[in-house]
Amino acid sequence: MSPDQEPAPRSTDPGKPAAARPLRAHARRNREKLIAAARAAFTAADDGAPLEGIAREAGVGIGTLYRHFPTREALVEAVYAAELEAVTADVTALLDELPPERALRAWMERYARFVATKRAMVNTLHSGWASGRITAPATRERITAAIGSLLAAGARTGALRGDVEADDVTAMLLGVFLSTAAEGDPSRTGRLLDLVVDALRTPVPSP
């Protein structure tokens, strides 16, 4: 067995598929390294990056890559899922570190990066959307839930308005990203995100 090979999982239940069981630690590390290498490759180029190069960058053989991800689509979808999980999980940590209004702005920046890197994978992601393996409504629900947590925290402190629907903010952000997609100008995206946050602040009472 070569260093990058993973032992085939053994089942004590012949009726249970091997893929349904948790990965062993070595296999899990290899999977994480492959996703990290693929994320870097897709961000730097596009989802046409050679799989052999991704495996080499991850420090594993091409056979290991195909054991985890039988198709390019499976790898792209895994990168998408990992990044979506990361961007939605950031909310708790940001609220622990920053006031809600600043946490919201920082999270928007991370979400903008998430959206920007997906442009390089969009052709392959289309097949996932078409097949139902990736659902746009589910993605939007998770993003909206993250925004809702940030808005609720801001409303509790009085820093952010309490009369705004989280899904309306999701729509605003998608509008920002769509309007700036062709420009590739992060500074303009940042200015527009500042305007969104300003619109969400609790109005200062008139004297």
Give the predicted meaning of each segment.
Residues 59-69:
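Short hydrophobic/aromatic patch on the recognition helix
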Residues 1-57, 74:
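Basic, helix-initiating cap at the start of DNA-binding domains
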Residues 85, 117, 131-167, 171-174, ...:
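Amphipathic alpha-helical packing segments from all-alpha helical-bundle domains
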Residues 1-18, 113, 145, 149-157, ...:
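C-terminal peripheral helix-coil segments that are non-catalytic and often amphipathic
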Residues 73-75, 120:
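A secondary-structure capping/hinge motif
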Residues 78, 92-117, 135:
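Hydrophobic alpha-helical connector segments
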Residues 124-132:
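Short linear capping/connector segments at secondary-structure termini
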Residues 76-83:
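Alpha-helical DNA-contacting segments of helix-turn-helix folds
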